[in-house]
Amino acid sequence: MNFQTLEDADTYKWHHAFPEKSRVLADRKYAEYPTFRSSELVVGKLLGQGAFCGVYEVTKIKMRRKDNDSATKDSEAKPINTHSDVLHQLQNSADAVNNRANEVKGENGIVHKLNLEESDLLKKTEDREDIVNCFQNDDAKYAIKIVNTTIDPNLVHDAMIDLAIEARFLAVLDHPNIIRLRAIGHGDPCEDGFFLLLDRIGDTLEVRLRQWKMADFRMKKKISKIMDPKGKKKISLFQERIAAAIEIAMGMQFIHSFNIIYRDLKPDNIGFDMKGRVKIFDFGLSRELDKDDSEKDGTYKLTGCVGSLRYMAPEIALNQSYNNKIDNYAYSMVLWEMLALVQPFENFDVKMHYERVVKGDYRPEIAEYLSPVLKKTLKCCWSPQSNDRLTFAELVIALSGEINTPKRGKGLP
């Protein structure tokens, strides 16, 4: 799609993420989030990196008490971001979106501005202090997400917009199984140095899957069977995986309750915090849907081929219209991987995947030891017909009944 100006591209991208009657943008929570300047944070090692952004650990917080305090330099500090070409063209578009977030329609359609009251500003200051106190008392560990300084300069604009969009989503998605946004970078989200202050992830599901696979391998050895004849360790490992699958479904259920489509559910985007709780993160491909924009069959005309092919529903791979049930398909592949401890379609190249999975309805083999409920759950959720797929509310109920299914480890492989 061609745009005459950068601002036109801006506006398109914002409206592509949020409908005109956006529930997310209308929420005041974003405006109430505390802010930090980059000079107040000392960052450490790189924890993870995507195509556009990097996530770094926060090693120190040096809170400035007043805005007019001069920033103190610290030899430990690393520059958070320094793009030479600040994209001032984004300002008007960003301001327009920020204004929409602080407007409500009253009687007769009259638009009223919502202003931050003194109590709101006081609350933001208290929140800053709470964040610092929790960090200093070792009650919380944080990370920042920022635009990579090494990406193609032509992609910086898109990266900044994506990060600003993600901030909007996380501001309203306050749930135990979704990564927690704690604060945002001071200033305009479309300027250099903007960042998200997030709870730190301990590891990802990708890492946890490797750990489970190694544990499962050890349990299959003869000595393990002698030491654990009733298979209690197998049962515990199975229950741990089912419990994690339930938490993922609960987080996705909450996301869908806002009519948000996630579009990139995979092990790399599912983490575990320092206490072992599941956290869904990376909302760069998420979009808010408006039912008024849907087709007669309940689908939407959205960008195709979005996400990771291994977990991509057929309709999105075929560039057909789709809805949030593509997330349920992706979940079925993640669930199967958690149960089988093998990547789905691990030996398929792109052409084979397209011919056999997308067009041919080939699916992974379901293990015989799984219960009838789990077998049916997988088959329903990876059905080529999106209407056959269980909702996440239904998935939570189905899986909750499975947590104690294996009464004896002998029923497991």
Regions found by a protein language model. Name each.
Residues 191-204:
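Conserved short submotifs of the Hanks-type protein kinase catalytic core
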Residues 256-272:
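Catalytic-loop of the protein kinase fold
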Residues 180-194:
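Short beta-strand micro-motifs within the conserved protein kinase catalytic domain, predominantly
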Residues 244-245:
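Activation segment signature within eukaryotic-like protein kinase domains
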Residues 299-315:
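Conserved activation segment of eukaryotic-like protein kinases, specifically the C-terminal portion
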